[in-house]
């Protein structure tokens, strides 16, 4: 293990385990969305130009903000994390970190992210990160998650904020392309999350979390997945006027593939077959990464946008 390797080099294993526990609180894998969304958005906002300093500074500030939100989410969800098999090994669920310490850690990260982004970018970017943290903790985690099956629909708005933060860091405003990218992630979140929840619905049921797969039939859930997948793909195409042909081609091809997977899942359920929703969950990550990577390449090349050909 990582801790063992560090122990061998002279660092106490207890200290290393504590450090790794605090890192785990921030949910590093979830923060990957920050990297996927922020960099291409910033490149689009400053089309044809790369400001490495600003990109790195925004990523660091955004990472602290996301880490803060995830840590405070762990604090609020510690009771249900102990019940669910998928989350039982999280630091607070196994008492690897005192709850009070985790709370202070999360708050400090949030304040630091605001101060950093205000200093390195602008006040709007810092304010957007604070709004994201507050929304994720109070609206989603404490308000919606345990009360409605539509929790991830509205609560997922917090995960869309990297697009707004990235755009505002470059321009100091929130332009319509940033809102379109916000919409892409907003509509992508339900099918992505519901596919996972289909696989772990008994976990959610035991924890008392009314995810859609817990309270609705598989046919209803997969139908909703198809609807939101269509909305996701259509929203990616709405961004085309602000981009070039590379992004347009990637969005079309990747969108067709994503739609095919969603429809296959729905068709399998309709036929009464044993389906594998986790496959859609995993591949939806690849879909989003491909679309945003296509946007990044398109933006770096800086070719004329499709919208410019129409005046």
From Swiss-Prot:
Membrane topology reported for the UniProt record: Multi-pass membrane protein
A cellular component annotation (GO) from this entry: plasma membrane
Pathway listed: Porphyrin-containing compound metabolism; heme O biosynthesis; heme O from protoheme: step 1/1
Keyword Lyase: no
A Gene Ontology molecular function term of the record: protoheme IX farnesyltransferase activity
Coiled coil residues, start to end: none
One of the GO BP terms on file: heme O biosynthetic process
Broad class of where this protein is predominantly found: membrane
Locations listed in the record: Cell membrane
UniProt catalytic activity: heme b + (2E,6E)-farnesyl diphosphate + H2O = Fe(II)-heme o + diphosphate
EC number, as in UniProt: 2.5.1.141
Pfam families assigned to the protein according to its UniProt record, in alphabetical order: UbiA
CDD domains assigned: PT_UbiA_Cox10
Membrane-spanning parts: 19-39, 55-75, 101-121, 123-143, 169-189, 221-241, 242-262, 290-310
Keywords: Cell membrane, Heme biosynthesis, Membrane, Transferase, Transmembrane, Transmembrane helix
Uppermost EC category: transferase
Function according to Swiss-Prot or TrEMBL: Converts heme B (protoheme IX) to heme O by substitution of the vinyl group on carbon 2 of heme B porphyrin ring with a hydroxyethyl farnesyl side group.
Database matches in PANTHER family: 4-HYDROXYBENZOATE SOLANESYLTRANSFERASE, PROTOHEME IX FARNESYLTRANSFERASE, MITOCHONDRIAL
Further facts: Carbon 2 of the heme B porphyrin ring is defined according to the Fischer nomenclature.
Family stated for the protein in its record: Belongs to the UbiA prenyltransferase family. Protoheme IX farnesyltransferase subfamily.
HAMAP family per the UniProt record, alphabetical: CyoE_CtaB (MF_00154)
Protein name: Protoheme IX farnesyltransferase
Gene: ctaB
């Amino acid at each position: 293990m990582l801790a063992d390797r560090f122990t061998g080099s002279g660092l106490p294993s207890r200290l290393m385990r504590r450090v790794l526990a605090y890192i785990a609180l921030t949910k590093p894998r979830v923060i990957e969305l920050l990297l996927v969304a922020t960099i291409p958005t910033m490149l689009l906002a400053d089309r044809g130009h790369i400001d490495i300093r600003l990109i790195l500074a925004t990523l660091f500030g955004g990472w602290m903000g996301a880490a803060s939100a995830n840590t405070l989410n762990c604090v609020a969800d510690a009771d249900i994390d102990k019940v669910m098999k998928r989350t039982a090994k999280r630091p607070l669920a196994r008492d690897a970190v005192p709850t009070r310490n985790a709370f202070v850690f999360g708050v400090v990260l949030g304040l630091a992210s605001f101060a950093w982004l205000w200093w390195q970018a602008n006040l709007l970017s810092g304010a957007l990160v604070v709004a994201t943290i507050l929304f994720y903790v109070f609206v989603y985690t404490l308000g919606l998650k345990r009360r409605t099956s539509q929790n991830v629909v509205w609560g997922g708005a917090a995960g869309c904020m990297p697009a707004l933060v990235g755009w505002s860091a470059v321009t100091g405003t929130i332009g319509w392309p940033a809102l379109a990218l916000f919409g892409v992630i907003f509509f992508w979140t339900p099918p992505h999350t519901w596919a996972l929840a289909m696989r772990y619905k008994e976990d959610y049921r035991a924890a008392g979390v009314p995810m859609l797969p817990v309270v609705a039939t598989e046919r209803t859930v997969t139908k909703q997945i198809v609807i939101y997948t269509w909305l996701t793909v259509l929203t990616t195409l709405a961004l085309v006027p602000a981009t070039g042909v590379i992004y347009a081609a990637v969005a079309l091809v990747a969108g067709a593939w994503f739609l095919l997977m969603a429809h296959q899942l729905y068709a399998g359920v309709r036929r009464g077959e044993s389906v594998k929703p986790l496959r859609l969950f995993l591949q939806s990550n690849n879909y989003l990464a491909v679309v945003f990577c296509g946007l990044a390449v398109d933006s770096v090349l800086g070719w004329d946008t499709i919208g410019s050909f129409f005046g």
